[in-house]
Amino acid sequence: MKRSMYAGRVRSEHIGTSITLKGWVGRRRDLGGLIFIDLRDREGIMQLVINPEEVAASVMATAESLRSEFVIEVSGVVTAREQANDNLPTGEVELKVQELSVLNTSKTTPFEIKDGIEANDDTRMRYRYLDLRRPEMLENFKLRAKVTHSIRNYLDNLEFIDVETPMLTKSTPEGARDYLVPSRVNQGHFYALPQSPQITKQLLMNAGFDRYYQIVKCFRDEDLRGDRQPEFTQVDLETSFLSDQEIQDIVEGMIAKVMKDTKGLEVSLPFPRMAYDDAMNNYGSDKPDTRFDMLLQDLTEIVKEVDFKVFSEASVVKAIVVKDKADKYSRKNIDKLTEIAKQYGAKGLAWLKYVDNTISGPVAKFLTAIEGRLTEALQLENNDLILFVADSLEVANETLGALRTRIAKELELIDYSKFNFLWVVDWPMFEWSEEEGRYMSAHHPFTLPTAETAHELEGDLAKVRAVAYDIVLNGYELGGGSLRINQKDTQERMFKALGFSAESAQEQFGFLLEAMDYGFPPHGGLAIGLDRFVMLLAGKDNIREVIAFPKNNKASDPMTQAPSLVSEQQLEELSLTVESYEN
């Protein structure tokens, strides 16, 4: 029989209609001789009623055999419920069954198919096809589909061209580790799965495409966390002949449309703009969460004369004030915060409490002479907790930024109904890597330096600024972009500043440098992390909730057991040997 409609879409206007439904048995209940079944499909749940006085004995026998997650086909008449269930969209109606057949049976599932299950993550991923049956998960992917549909409509209307770029490409340095794919035809050579379509989309601008976009898979072999996966999806854009402001305007319009189409929200345009240095100094993060206050305060000048060497001899002394929560933090609680501070490179965490117009705490005796200035500078009020870090500017900012976010979550200071977008601009071109002992690209080596600082490519690299911009949402980097280098000499200077010899630059990026000999237009773009965006729209804290078949924290798939060993024959065909199969 042909399905008439989705079970979750049956409403009171269908009363008296004969329909056929197909789906899964959510649960079965036997009450007073009647059998009640919750039939579930992707749109929701519909109650079925089987009355032994109104159906054939075979139908009743089939109903009695049903168990959770059996797949069934059922026909009957929609009737009004005697008692409506206000918790269900279908709660005013039920289906009086006339015909019933089993399309497939099911073993007992390892967890219940319902929201709010307590199964651990690996069990959910091992049986991902069952996990995805849960209404909550289905809603996540409906939302994701709405987001991509909205984005495509918006960009199509602006005459962007959707172009697929290669999945098998060249391995290049800078950034995360590549996933490598050995070539059978070209023995000893390897492709790389793209970390982004960065260079190919730039080449499309040189080809005259003018406006490109792609919703594209990318791959990075990096350590995983809640908002990272080894394979992820980007909304990738590139344009020619536009300024950074014009590109940002396009992106803002796209996000505004997505918010309207998916959440019914009007977002205020233009988005706020914040300089990178201000973000770091005030929020301790290059992706500031502006849904709550607790800004970092610089106290270096105030404390430099105190008789406390930890403060007086430090490069900087900065603090955050936790308003009206001093009584919530015992010494044990503060010790936990101190351990977190040490994880970010701080030597420790000094603290004070301000109660009844008096400071108290381990360092209070050193600060009595400046208590008035401190109280005024920090605008202290009763029951405030003050946390200090005395260290380099970078360590103080990063440590207090991390504590600021953790404390806000602990104390429930964040308004989760808000969607606070902003641009972080005026980025440094380079960042120093202690591990590498050299400057690295803060974004990537194709970013255009500002005209005012480009001369420092041969001088002080710390002074070079980039025409770069990150879009931030609620403390997460949603995406990043920049204007790109289109002049060959500037690109060669950039490679040299990053430590490339002329030979290595030619070996790695010769095709790009050659393209710059052929009228490369001014261009720029941006990429937005689709998984992260949908995660935030769905109110989740892990992108696994919005990726159909994600990897776990070991970059493995418990369902398919990927990655897996391969046969000796496959290795021989690729001229590869593996030293050990041991984990």
UniProtKB/Swiss-Prot annotation:
Its EC number is 6.1.1.12. Residues 198-201 are annotated as: Aspartate. It is an enzyme of class 6 (ligase). One of its GO terms (molecular function) is nucleic acid binding. It catalyses: tRNA(Asp) + L-aspartate + ATP = L-aspartyl-tRNA(Asp) + AMP + diphosphate. Its main location: cytoplasm. SUPFAM superfamilies: Class II aaRS and biotin synthetases (SSF55681), GAD domain-like (SSF55261), Nucleic acid-binding proteins (SSF50249). It comes from the Bacteria. InterPro entries: Aa-tRNA-synt_II, aa-tRNA-synth_II, aa-tRNA-synth_II/BPL/LPL, Asp-tRNA-ligase_1, Asp-tRNA-ligase_1_N, Asp/Asn-tRNA-synth_IIb, AspRS_core, GAD-like_sf. It is found in: Cytoplasm. L-aspartate binds at E174, R220, H443, R484. ATP binds at R220, D221, E222, Q229, E477, G529, L530, D531, R532. GO terms for cellular component: cytoplasm. One of its GO terms (biological process) is aspartyl-tRNA aminoacylation. Keywords: Aminoacyl-tRNA synthetase, ATP-binding, Cytoplasm, Ligase, Nucleotide-binding, Protein biosynthesis. Belongs to the class-II aminoacyl-tRNA synthetase family. Type 1 subfamily. Catalyzes the attachment of L-aspartate to tRNA(Asp) in a two-step reaction: L-aspartate is first activated by ATP to form Asp-AMP and then transferred to the acceptor end of tRNA(Asp). Homodimer. This is Aspartate--tRNA ligase. It comes from Streptococcus agalactiae serotype III (strain NEM316).
